[in-house]
Amino acid sequence: MIQGALHCDDTQRTLEGIQSLGAKVQVKKTRTISSGIRRPTTSNRSIDCGESGATLRFLTAISSASLKTIRLSCSRRLANRPLEPLVKAINSLGASAHAISDARGLEVLVKGPLRGGEVTLWGDISSQFISGLLFAAPLAIRDVTIKAEGALESRPYVKMSIDVLKKHGISIEESNGKFRVPAPQEFVPASHKVPGDFSSAAFLIAATGTVGDEITISGLGPYEFEPDSAILKLAPEIGLEVQQNGNSLTIAKRELDGFQFDASNNPDLVPPLETIGCFADGSSEIRGVKRLVYKESNRLQTLPTELAKMGAKIHAEDDMIKIEGSRELVGSALDSHDDHRVAMACAAASLGARGESIIHNSEAVSKSYPKFFQDLARLGVQLSVE
């Protein structure tokens, strides 16, 4: 049973995907109940992952444990994001996987069994490749060892995956950048309470930084399980006062100061922090950003481009973003580039800008935070949706 599951486009794609693999799922108001299966099965239709990268990567890996061919598809936009390292890893572990690209998008064909062995993946492209293989590895014929080559970025998300697997009775050994999963193993049922989503809440925190009003956000704990709660440690340095009361946070703005932040483990914090940096006194630097080119849009280009329309001065080079703060932003016609986090960052910046802004393709927020604009309205923001 899962309590507090997020309902958005991405999680809906995952839900439909696991149902196609044979799981029985009941979705209720506050909880989701799933009856598992010993091994993924096939369906007569392709699993449509839409634009959900996590769904595509996780279910591609899990499908490698099926004894029948599983078909997965995704949008053309998602097809441009990395998948080949995962496909190669699945083949190296004895299963069969190949991807076919055309004008409509991408189709992936996967068939097990996953025989086991050792595979190496670069750790600086997507941690979801490693998480996906960890989900599949217990169903392999023999032990699986996954080695992360180079720096493993977004390591906290791999740890989160391991914690979930351990709750389901799966044994995993980690040493010197290697993850060894004895196989075969059997999953046991477990219950989960999903912590609040700091990746989304960070945009409300950014809104506080741009306009200065105090806000309270509830339902965010326990913080130690959410990697993007790292923004709480940075907040005092930026000039945001944070008071914690159980699972609630109250955020108030003081004088904003320029800051430095390493986003290697928290790439989703870059858009809200980039927005805050525009209003801070002095310059700010965000490092560890090279993977932003692989997101829903190339965020190394798209967000600086949109904020520049408002008067922001942002420079992206190599693995760093530099933001010149203390600049007055002016409302403008902006575009989300169909990227949910760019849309929310533009909205947060617009709150502190002089004049009105229009955000085209703002519906992109439904990918992760469908009620974002409703929540802004509850906070007193004047907005209209056309």
Regions inferred by a protein language model and the residue ranges of each:
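Short, structured segments at the rim of ligand-binding sites
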Residues: 1-386
